[in-house]
Amino acid sequence: MIEVTRLNGTKLLINPHLLELVEETPDTVLTLTTGRKIIVKESRQDIKNLV
């Protein structure tokens, strides 16, 4: 599990096996294999290092 932070400050644990796509637009958007999108504070590089 990786810990990320939503823009409102809420901490969230995500199963890294569910990550399909990580985009910076300029916010970092995580797209899960379920189709759900989550906007987080961490950069694309931070997510890459966590996975």
Question: Where are these predicted regions, by residue range?
Answer:
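Acidic, Ser/Thr- and proline-rich intrinsically disordered linker/docking segments
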Residues: 7-12, 20-51
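A short beta-strand micro-motif
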Residues: 2-6
